[in-house]
Amino acid sequence: MRECLIARLTFTEYTQKSTIEIACGDTDAGKELLDTIIDVSRENSIYRGHNLHLSYESGKKDEYGDVEKPERFQITFSTIEDVTDEDIVLTEEHLTVLQRNIIDLYTRRDILEENGVPARRGVLLHGPPGTGKTFACRFLCHKLQGVTCMFVTGSSLLNVGAIFSFARLLQPAVLFLEDVDLIFATREINLYSTALGDLLDQMDGLRARENISVVLTTNAIDRLEAAIKDRPGRISQCIYMGAPAPAQRRLFLAHQLRDHDAAAVDIEQLVRDSDGATQAFLKEW
C-alpha cells in the first residue's frame, strides 16, 4: 500500500458518532486504506452473527434551527427466546416456504451463486395478532446460525437507510421488520411518505450478490402499501398465518404443559375446546 496518513479518529459523545478522516496525497491510496479499515471492522464486529435489536430516536431542533436533541441509532443484543426444531408448531407448508425462501439462501448460497440465482428475498408474514409471526421469525434465527439477524419495529422503521446500511456491513444478514403497516401504510393514509419511499429504494437497491433478506410482518395487510406487497422484486412470498389447526394446537398445548404434571389433563378435549384460538390465546388460556 502506498504511503498514507490517518489524520484523525474521533468519537463525539453528544451525537454518539465516530468519524475517520484520512489525509493523503494520493486519493486512490486513501480510499484503499479506508476500504481496508471498513473491511476489517466488518469482519471483526462484535455484532456479526448475533441477534440484534435496532432502535432509532429522531432528533429535535429548537426554534432557531439548532440541534436540541441529536438523533440516535442504538444497537442492543436481542434476548429473544430460542425456538428449536422440537418447539416447532408451524404447519409443514409454512416450514417448506420458509426453508425455500429464506433458510436455503444461506445454507446453499454457493450452489445458488453457481447457477446465477440471486441470494436475496423478501418475505411478508401476515395474519391476525398472536398467530405465530414472531414465533416464525425466532425459528428462522435458530436455523440461521452465524447469520446476523436484526429486529426493527415501531418508529425505528423511520430510519430505513441506516438499517439497510448496517445490514450491508454485517451481511450475511436478515432484517426482521415488524408491524410494517404502522409506518408503511398505503399512500392514501400514510403519514410517513418519506420513509415509505426510502424502504422501496432500499429494497430495489439490494444487489444480486448482497446476502441480505428482508422478512416483514403485519397484522393488517390491507393497510400495507401495494408497492411493497404486490411487487415480486421486493416481496417474493406472502405467507398467511391464521389460527392454528388442531394438529398445531395439540403440539402447542403439549409444549406448554411439558414442564408440568399434566397427567390428568385431557389434551384432546382442550384441542376441541380451543377451535379458532390463536397461539397467543392458548399461551394465556
Residue ranges and their predicted role:
Residues T27, K31, D222, P246-A247, ...:
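Loop/helix-junction capping segments adjacent to catalytic residues or to phosphate/diphosphate-binding pockets
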Residues A29-I37, I163, F252, W285:
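Hydrophobic side chains in well-ordered alpha-helices
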Residues M1-R109, R120, S155:
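AAA+ P-loop ATPase mechanoenzymes
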Residues L124, S274-W285:
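The conserved phosphate-sensing helix
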Residues T84-L270:
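Walker A/P-loop NTP-binding motif of AAA+ ATPase domains
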